[in-house]
Amino acid sequence: MAYRGQGQKVQKVMVQPINLIFRYLQNRSRISVWLYEQVNMRIEGCIIGFDEYMNLVLDDAEEVHMKTKNRKPLGRIMLKGDNITLLQSVSN
C-alpha cells in the first residue's frame, strides 16, 4: 500500500483484463491485436463483442503487415482468443 503525506493511504486498484476489454467496447476504441506466433501481422478494429474465452468480434477490422505497412480490409470478423497475445489501443 502506498502512503501520501500526513497519514493518508492511497490504495492501488487492480484492473481486471475483462474490465479493460469492456472499456474498449464501451468507448468504441480502435485497438491493435498482436497475434500469437505471427509477429509480422496485426489486426486492427473496434471491439463490438467478446466472451469469457477472449474471443473478439471486431468491426471495421484490417490486417496490418508490419514490414510493408500494407492494410487489407476484413470488415466484421470473429477472432479466437487463442490467437491473441496483446491488445493495445491505437489512435486514428
UniProtKB/Swiss-Prot annotation:
One annotated GO molecular function: RNA binding
One Gene Ontology biological process: spliceosomal snRNP assembly
Subcellular location: Cytoplasm, Cytosol; Nucleus
Regions annotated as coiled coil: none
Keyword Zinc-finger tagged: no
Statement: the UniProt record of this protein carries the keyword RNA-binding: yes
CDD domains xrefs: Sm_E
GO cellular component: cytosol; methylosome; nucleus; pICln-Sm protein complex; precatalytic spliceosome; SMN-Sm protein complex; U1 snRNP; U2 snRNP
Residue stretches making up the Sm domain: 18-92
Keywords: Cytoplasm, mRNA processing, mRNA splicing, Nucleus, Ribonucleoprotein, RNA-binding, Spliceosome
Protein role: Plays a role in pre-mRNA splicing as a core component of the spliceosomal U1, U2, U4 and U5 small nuclear ribonucleoproteins (snRNPs), the building blocks of the spliceosome. Component of both the pre-catalytic spliceosome B complex and activated spliceosome C complexes. As a component of the minor spliceosome, involved in the splicing of U12-type introns in pre-mRNAs. As part of the U7 snRNP it is involved in histone 3'-end processing.
Self-association state and partner proteins as the record states: Core component of the spliceosomal U1, U2, U4 and U5 small nuclear ribonucleoproteins (snRNPs), the building blocks of the spliceosome. Most spliceosomal snRNPs contain a common set of Sm proteins, snrpb, snrpd1, snrpd2, snrpd3, snrpe, snrpf and snrpg that assemble in a heptameric protein ring on the Sm site of the small nuclear RNA to form the core snRNP. Component of the U1 snRNP. The U1 snRNP is composed of the U1 snRNA and the 7 core Sm proteins snrpb, snrpd1, snrpd2, snrpd3, snrpe, snrpf and snrpg, and at least three U1 snRNP-specific proteins snrnp70/u1-70k, snrpa/u1-a and snrpc/u1-c.
Protein family per UniProt: Belongs to the snRNP Sm proteins family.
This protein's name: Small nuclear ribonucleoprotein E
Naturally occurring in which organism (per UniProt): Danio rerio
Gene (UniProt): snrpe
